[in-house]
Amino acid sequence: MSSYANHQALAGLTLGKSTDYRDTYDASLLQGVPRSLNRDPLGLKADNLPFHGTDIWTLYELSWLNAKGLPQVAVGHVELDYTSVNLIESKSFKLYLNSFNQTRFNNWDEVRQTLERDLSTCAQGKISVALYRLDELEGQPIGHFNGTCIDDQDITIDNYEFTTDYLENATSGEKVVEETLVSHLLKSNCLITHQPDWGSIQIQYRGRQIDREKLLRYLVSFRHHNEFHEQCVERIFNDLLRFCQPEKLSVYARYTRRGGLDINPWRSNSDFVPSTTRLVRQ
């Protein structure tokens, strides 16, 4: 269990509780979770973070009424900056989006501006929102993470409790390498409900070579770990930076969707540019 799982900042969340669904616009449904909850135990300070990045959200169940009452549908793309005070809690995001369903808006841009304003207010940070008509995305290919997949290893694993022990002495040699490693075996659990979160992760680094078996064992140790998606990615970045000490590091996870939303956080200390095309499980 995470050290802050019972923090008072989480007590008021609708997550894990029975809720009524509202279909008329209500910005108060949005709830934020302070990023400091997981950053403080990691020794990460808001004014001196070792990374930059965004939380990329895809909104698959977004609908509202136009001025004449005709339903509209769109796919939304949201990027929340890593410097925001709060992350957006996903169940509250879903409930908030449901409140658009029977609400009339004059045009698409009004919807976009409303989303941008409300999400920025909740997160207390910079955010960008784009809305796409379905025909703009039809035929878009399924993407994949570039890099070497480390999953096909003939190893025995019998420990699924989170530990950084596997990263001890996980680098070897003095030669500097630059490589991208990928795993589809990332599984963590919701901080509150403990429901499973499934993801693929891409780790791009420059530095002493990281032992792939030790890295895979470390990633598998998240299997019983309870944290939000964004928190897991920051923990992985921080652990790799601390134990492996790469010159450059980027960590990017794309999680499967739940409630019509998928969350795809990335953190980097280099000029990393994430691919935003959905993966096969998304």
From Swiss-Prot:
<feature type="active site" description="Thioimide intermediate">
    <location>
        <position position="190"/>
    </location>
</feature>
<comment type="subunit">
    <text>Homodimer.</text>
</comment>
<keyword id="KW-0521">NADP</keyword>
<dbReference type="GO" id="GO:0006400">
    <property type="term" value="P:tRNA modification"/>
</dbReference>
<dbReference type="InterPro" id="IPR016428">
    <property type="entry name" value="QueF_type2"/>
</dbReference>
<dbReference type="Pfam" id="PF14489">
    <property type="entry name" value="QueF"/>
</dbReference>
<keyword id="KW-0963">Cytoplasm</keyword>
<comment type="similarity">
    <text>Belongs to the GTP cyclohydrolase I family. QueF type 2 subfamily.</text>
</comment>
<feature type="binding site">
    <location>
        <begin position="229"/>
        <end position="230"/>
    </location>
    <ligand>
        <name>substrate</name>
    </ligand>
</feature>
<feature type="binding site">
    <location>
        <begin position="88"/>
        <end position="90"/>
    </location>
    <ligand>
        <name>substrate</name>
    </ligand>
</feature>
<dbReference type="InterPro" id="IPR029500">
    <property type="entry name" value="QueF"/>
</dbReference>
<dbReference type="InterPro" id="IPR029139">
    <property type="entry name" value="QueF_N"/>
</dbReference>
<dbReference type="Pfam" id="PF14819">
    <property type="entry name" value="QueF_N"/>
</dbReference>
<keyword id="KW-0560">Oxidoreductase</keyword>
<comment type="function">
    <text>Catalyzes the NADPH-dependent reduction of 7-cyano-7-deazaguanine (preQ0) to 7-aminomethyl-7-deazaguanine (preQ1).</text>
</comment>
<dbReference type="GO" id="GO:0005737">
    <property type="term" value="C:cytoplasm"/>
</dbReference>
<keyword id="KW-0671">Queuosine biosynthesis</keyword>
<comment type="pathway">
    <text>tRNA modification; tRNA-queuosine biosynthesis.</text>
</comment>
<dbReference type="InterPro" id="IPR043133">
    <property type="entry name" value="GTP-CH-I_C/QueF"/>
</dbReference>
<feature type="active site" description="Proton donor">
    <location>
        <position position="197"/>
    </location>
</feature>
<dbReference type="GO" id="GO:0033739">
    <property type="term" value="F:preQ1 synthase activity"/>
</dbReference>
<dbReference type="InterPro" id="IPR050084">
    <property type="entry name" value="NADPH_dep_7-cyano-7-deazaG_red"/>
</dbReference>
<feature type="binding site">
    <location>
        <begin position="90"/>
        <end position="91"/>
    </location>
    <ligand>
        <name>NADPH</name>
    </ligand>
</feature>
<dbReference type="GO" id="GO:0008616">
    <property type="term" value="P:queuosine biosynthetic process"/>
</dbReference>
<protein>
    <recommendedName>
        <fullName>NADPH-dependent 7-cyano-7-deazaguanine reductase</fullName>
        <ecNumber>1.7.1.13</ecNumber>
    </recommendedName>
</protein>
<feature type="binding site">
    <location>
        <begin position="258"/>
        <end position="259"/>
    </location>
    <ligand>
        <name>NADPH</name>
    </ligand>
</feature>
